Each structure stands twice: as C-alpha cells, then as structure tokens.
C-alpha cells in the first residue's frame, strides 16, 4: 500500500511538472536522459595523492548501520522479549547457547512470579512494583540488544529479494565479459558456466540447465541490466563506482558486502564450497542455510546471526572467488592474454584464501593489518604485471577491484594510495637507543592499538555495578523492614521475626517463592544492564587512550614514555598521514552499538529524574513511603554517576583530538628550521601554509562532545531541558522556600 501511494505521488509530481516546462527544459531533459551512455569512455583512476573532506571528518571510515528505523527496531525488540520462547532461534543466533539458556530461565521465572502474584491470597505485603519492575528492565534490555545486532540482518537466501540481487550480480559479471572483448556470445557463457562446475561437485542436471538458461536470459537482456546498473552507480556519500556495479552503502560498508555474498549461496549453490580449502559438506551447508530463523516479521526477514555468518560467509566467499578465475581463463584464452595476468589472478585468489583459512573467528588486529597490507601489495603487483604485457587487458585488476572489500566500503585511503608502500620516517626507541625507521600509517596505528589493548583497565565501575545490582535486589527487603519497625526497634526483634517481616510471610509458600524469584530475576537483570554500561565505559576509556597516544606522536618525550613512534609534521606528506591517522583512530572500536547503550542509559535517566521530581512535587512528605520511589532514587544516583563518567571521558577525548596546540607547535618548529636552513625556506613555507589550513579545517569540522539520544535534535533537546530542569527547579524551590531557575533556552 505504501509503495502504491509513493508511486502515485511520483506520477502526479511529474504530471504537474509537465505543465510548467518550456521548450528549453524539455530539450535539456532529453539530453540528461541520454547521460553517459553514448559518451566515449577510457580507463581512469582516482588520484591517490589527494584527500577528501570525508577523510578528515572521519566519514570515509564508515561503520555499519541498521536498515530499519529505530521505531521498527524498538517494536521488534519488545515483541521478541514478550514472546521470547517463540523467537528462540533468533536469540540463539544473536547470543550464545549459554546466554540464551540463562535468559530463558529468567523469562520463565518472571512468568512464574507474575502467576504467583496473581494467585497468592490478597492480604500480603508484597507491592506490585516488586514483580512488575523486572519486566520493564527486561523490555529495555531486549530493545537495546535488538538495536545493537540490527546491522547483521541479511535477507533470506531463498527469498525474492535475494534472487533479484543474485540476478543483478550475474548480469554485472556478464557485462565484465562484454567489456573484455566487446562481443561475448551465448556459447561462451554457457561453456564457461559448464566449466565452472567441478567434476566432483554434487550438482543435479536440472540445476545445470537452470543456470544455463539464466545465463542465456541475462545475456540477451544485458543492455537492460546495464542501463539499470548505470543509473545506480552513485552511492549515498557521493562516491561513484568505476566498474558500473552498484556498490554497497557507506553506512553498511564491509558487513553488507559479506551479506550479499552470503545471500548468493543457496542449497543448490553450496557445492561451490566443496572446491575450496575450507570445504564443508554440502549437506551441512544446506542444513545451516535452510535452518535460518523464520519467525521474524515479514518486513525484515530472518536475521542470520554470528554463527551462521562466520561459517557460511567464508565458505561462499572462497567458492565465489574460486569460480571467477575459471571464467576469466576461458574468456581470455582465445585472445592470447598474457600469462602474467592469469598467474597473478590465481596468486591473488590463493593468497586471500590462505589468509582467510588461517583467520580465527574473532580477528585480531595483527591479522587485519597483515591482510590489509598484503592485499594492497598484491593488487599493485597484479596491476604492474598485466599493464606491462597488455594495458588493454587486465582481468586480475578488474576482478580484484570489483571484489575488494575495502573498495566496497569506500576506503580510498586504504586501497588506492597503497598504505603498505606509502611511508614516513619515524623515530622509535629500543631501550635507550634511538633509531629511525620508515613506517606506514597502518604500522603506526597498529602500535598504538597494541598499547591500548595491553592497558589494564580498572575495575572500580565493575565493582560499583555489582554493588548496585545487589542493593537493588535487597531494596524490597529493607523497605519492608523500615515500614514495619523503626531503626531503634530492630535490635529488639529476633532473627525469625525479622525474617518474617523481610520476606512478607512465614507460612505462605507462594509468597516466599514469589519473593525469592523476584530477587533472583531483579539482581540478574540489573547486573546485565550495568554490565553493558561497564562495556560502554571501557570503550570510552579506550577512545581516550587512542586520543592520548595520538597526541604523543609529535612529542619526543611523551612518545618515548608511551613507547610509540615519533615524527614531526615537517613535510606535507607527514601532515596528510597525520590527518588520516587521526580520523582512523577516531573511528576505531565499537561506535554505534556503544552509542545505543549510552543513549538508553541517558533516556532512562531522564525518565527516572522526571518521575522523581513529579513525585516530590506531588507528595514530598510521604515520598519514601512507596517502594518504587526507593528504587527510583537508587537508579537516579547510579545512572547519573555513569553518565558523568561518559561525559567526562567523551569531552576529554574530543579535547585531545581538537588540540590545535600541536599544530601551532609544529609551525614554531618550522620557523626555527627556516632560521637554521635558509636554503629550504620555500619548502618549509609551503608546509607551514598547509599546517595553517589544517588548523582551520580542524576547527571547522570538530564539534563538542554530546551524549547521543535526544541531544542530537536541538528542538527535542531544548524541550527535554525545559521539562527536566523546570521540574528540578520546582523541587528545589519547594524544599528551600525560594524561587530558583536552572534552565535557559538556547537557540
């Protein structure tokens, strides 16, 4: 229904726009429709020695983003928590078997507590909030987790969407053959398709004929497919695909690239995996793919989790890469293609497979750097070898350029400028010896990351979270004791009497069971929530360490103390790599997932503060006579401490990265160098001008740190500020006896 309304809007927009057109506008539209189809084209390359503003801003290093809006994710999270057992397959995919079992036990205990509360005899001292409170926390945790894992939501492999994308990919691969010789025929396509099937592949005759028919169909309609692909070559962040293939969005970068490959592996396509070094039985692959969760709502499709992706993605990726060299070898055999290109293609493919086969499930930083540098050098060697033989034919370069994940994720700094070859002279210390070495940006960042990973974090906030979990679990018992007797009379009661008062009953088994179950569920859920906050706190701390070590690079004393390389911004190339390293380190580590956790804590704190202020303004004399108010006060204090920690770390990190005193110091060093070496004054003046421009650019792009959530929208931020601070002002004015304003609207 929504698509029909959208089509109607587009149609009517064009209809009324036709009445406003003049002759000149119609002729211009006809020229625009032709576009670049009839224009002569030749091979071009992006200039690797230039930088984009996206590189300085950091958006070039894009992170994965969810396809669905936050409202849809919130709704799905609530549904998946309420009907937890029915979504067991999804929870198993996005968590682990142990965690799922733990959550299932908590879910069943919570259901049992509700049943016991409704079935227990009415005269008991157990408040409703003691049983209902864990439910709200469970819904919050489920929503947060659903938003965190929302970036890994591939569509079903056997669905219509997957078939449509598979058709587009096959059409795009056929266009590659057409570009190679200009006249690829159906026979060549069919022959290549037959050759791609291995002798030992468990393929049925019907599957072979189906693929042959698909190849012939897409070859006949290749012009139509090419037109549809050409219209969609521009991506969301302004990059244009050079090979005519629709690239993935920058907001989904590498994760979406693997998802597309996972979608192309159906039950019948699983035979490709048997030809790779990381081979798995076709039946196992088929079983794993067909067992994808089918209980998710229809608009999102089943969400394949980490275990499936970690097993199938590498298999499908290796299978697809093994299949493509057969196409190229067959295609270029009749044209006397240089042997160097073919050998280079197989070498690139085999080297990538070797690196993937030895890669563990959780990739370490060292393997990432090694693979990244290796891919860059492999690409450069492929290009140089094939260009020498025949510059018109370069199958290796084209295939690798199309399949390169760094190209797919819009990282021109990583794949175009060859970071493995672009180095700067840096000083390193080995004990008391000072030595000079040529280092790339990846090597410098790798040393910084190793230093951060070796840092031993404190456990203060972990202990604080554990203490708050225990305190919130014991709050109902303390509340009943305080309501029953005064503090002076506690010593007069025996232990058995205190036990009866704390648990609300002595003989009723249902009440005792309900209290114990609520205690276990409450402590467990609160501990999970503060565990997430501790993860966010550790991430913010690592970001601060990244910023600190980055600031130590241009200081000889601090670099030696921190055991990181040291270099000066005395060349334009050094400034470029310094800016690249700065943006790269800012984007390292968890970003959106941690922001989701912090945003949830921020919104929860706002809600708790507002409820507390409303309760204090309503009846502040009997504020502590309600059990939920006790819990709200504890939540408010604990969450405020964590938020203050987040704000402190985030502001300090932004301050470290926005420290223009480094650039000013380097400008002073350049003037000192001009005085000592007048013959290099022109070169040093050029570097000084670039430093001034870099200083202005950083001031232009940098913004102060803000917690995510309502603060992203200025209107909502001002409304929230007015509501919350007005309530706090009213409480303080009521308690102190004079008017006090704590807020001021800012435009």
From Swiss-Prot:
Disordered: region residues: 170-192, 268-365
Sugar-bearing residue positions: 291, 659, 718
Glycoprotein in keyword set: yes
Alphabetized InterPro entries for the sequence: PHTF1/2, PHTF1/2_N
GO CC list: endoplasmic reticulum; membrane
Principal localisation: membrane
Record field: transmembrane: 98-118, 126-146, 459-479, 515-535, 596-616, 630-650, 722-742
Source domain of life: Eukaryota
Subcellular location: Membrane
Membrane topology: Multi-pass membrane protein
Keyword Ribonucleoprotein part of the UniProt annotation: no
Domain PHTF residues, every copy: 6-153
Record field: compositional bias (Basic and acidic residues): 172-181, 353-362
Biased composition (Polar residues): 182-192
Pfam family, one: PHTF1-2_N
Entry keyword set: Glycoprotein, Membrane, Transmembrane, Transmembrane helix
Biased composition (Basic residues): 321-331
Bias kind Low complexity: ranges: 340-352
Annotated protein name in UniProt: Protein PHTF2
Source lineage: Eukaryota, Metazoa, Chordata, Craniata, Vertebrata
Gene designation per UniProt: Phtf2
């Amino acid at each position: 229904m929504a698509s029909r309304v959208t089509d109607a809007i587009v149609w009517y927009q064009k209809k009324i726009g036709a009445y406003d057109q003049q002759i000149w506008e119609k002729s211009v539209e006809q020229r625009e429709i032709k576009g670049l189809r009839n224009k002569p084209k030749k091979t071009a390359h992006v200039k690797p020695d230039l930088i984009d503003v996206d590189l300085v801003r950091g958006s070039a290093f894009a992170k994965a983003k969810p396809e669905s809006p936050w409202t849809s994710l919130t709704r799905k999270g609530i549904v998946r928590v309420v009907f937890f057992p029915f979504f067991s397959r999804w929870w198993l995919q996005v968590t682990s078997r142990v965690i799922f079992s733990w959550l299932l036990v908590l879910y069943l205990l919570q259901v049992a507590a509700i049943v016991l509360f409704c079935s227990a005899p009415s005269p008991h001292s157990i408040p409703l909030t003691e049983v209902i409170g864990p439910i709200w926390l469970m819904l919050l945790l489920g929503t947060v987790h659903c938003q965190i894992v929302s970036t890994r939501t591939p569509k079903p492999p056997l669905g219509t969407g997957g078939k449509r994308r598979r058709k587009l990919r096959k059409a795009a691969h056929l266009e590659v053959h057409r570009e190679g010789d200009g006249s690829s025929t159906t026979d060549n396509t069919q022959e290549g398709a037959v050759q791609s099937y291995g002798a030992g592949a468990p393929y049925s005759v019907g599957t072979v004929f189906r693929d042959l028919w698909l190849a012939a169909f897409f070859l006949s309609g290749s012009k139509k497919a090419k037109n549809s692909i050409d219209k969609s070559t521009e991506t969301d962040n302004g990059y244009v695909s050079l090979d005519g293939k629709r690239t993935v969005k920058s907001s989904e970068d590498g994760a979406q690239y693997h998802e597309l490959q996972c979608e192309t592996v159906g039950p019948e396509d699983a035979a490709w995996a048997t030809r790779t070094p990381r081979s798995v039985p076709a039946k196992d692959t088929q079983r794993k793919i067909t067992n994808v969760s089918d209980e998710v709502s229809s608009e999102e499709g089943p969400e394949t989790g980490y275990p499936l992706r970690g097993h199938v993605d590498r298999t499908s990726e290796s299978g697809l890469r093994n299949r493509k060299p057969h196409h190229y070898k067959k295609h270029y055999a009749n044209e006397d293609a240089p042997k160097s290109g073919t050998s280079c293609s197989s070498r690139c493919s085999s080297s990538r497979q070797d690196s993937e086969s030895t890669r563990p499930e959780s990739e370490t930083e060292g393997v990432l750097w090694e693979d990244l540098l290796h891919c860059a050098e492999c690409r450069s060697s492929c290009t140089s070898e094939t260009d020498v033989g025949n510059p018109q034919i370069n199958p290796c370069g084209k295939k690798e350029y199309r399949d390169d994940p760094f190209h797919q994720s819009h990282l021109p700094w990583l794949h175009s400028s060859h970071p493995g070859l672009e180095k700067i002279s840096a000083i390193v210390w080995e004990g008391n010896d000072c030595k000079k070495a040529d280092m790339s940006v990846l090597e410098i960042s790798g040393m910084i990351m190793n230093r951060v990973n070796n840092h031993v974090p404190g456990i203060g906030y972990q202990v604080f979270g554990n203490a708050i979990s225990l305190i919130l679990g014991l709050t109902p018992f303390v509340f009943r004791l305080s309501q029953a007797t005064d503090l002076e009379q506690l010593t007069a009661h025996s232990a058995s009497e205190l036990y009866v008062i704390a648990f609300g009953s002595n003989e009723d088994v249902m009440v005792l069971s309900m209290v114990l179950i609520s205690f276990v569920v409450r402590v467990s859920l609160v501990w999970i929530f503060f565990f997430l906050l501790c993860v966010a706190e550790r991430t913010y701390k690592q970001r601060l360490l990244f910023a600190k070590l980055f600031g130590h690079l241009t200081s000889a004393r601090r670099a030696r103390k921190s055991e990181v390389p040291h270099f000066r911004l005395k060349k334009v190339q050094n400034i470029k790599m310094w800016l690249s390293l700065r943006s790269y380190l800012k984007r390292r580590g968890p970003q959106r997932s941690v922001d989701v956790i912090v945003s949830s804590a921020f919104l929860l704190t706002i809600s708790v503060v507002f409820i507390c202020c409303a309760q204090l303004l309503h009846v502040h004399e009997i504020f502590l006579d309600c059990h939920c108010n006790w819990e709200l006060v504890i939540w408010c204090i604990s969450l405020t401490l964590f938020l203050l920690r987040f704000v402190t770390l985030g502001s300090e990190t932004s301050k470290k990265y926005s420290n223009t005193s480094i650039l000013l110091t380097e400008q002073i060093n350049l003037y000192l160098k001009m005085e000592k070496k007048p013959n290099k004054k022109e070169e040093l003046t050029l570097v000084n001008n670039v430093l001034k421009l870099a200083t202005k650019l950083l001031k232009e792009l940098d913004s102060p740190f803000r917690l995510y959530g309502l603060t992203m929208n200025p209107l909502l931020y001002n409304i929230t500020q007015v509501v919350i601070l007005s309530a706090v002002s009213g409480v303080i004015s009521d308690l102190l006896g004079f008017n006090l304003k704590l807020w001021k609207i800012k435009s």
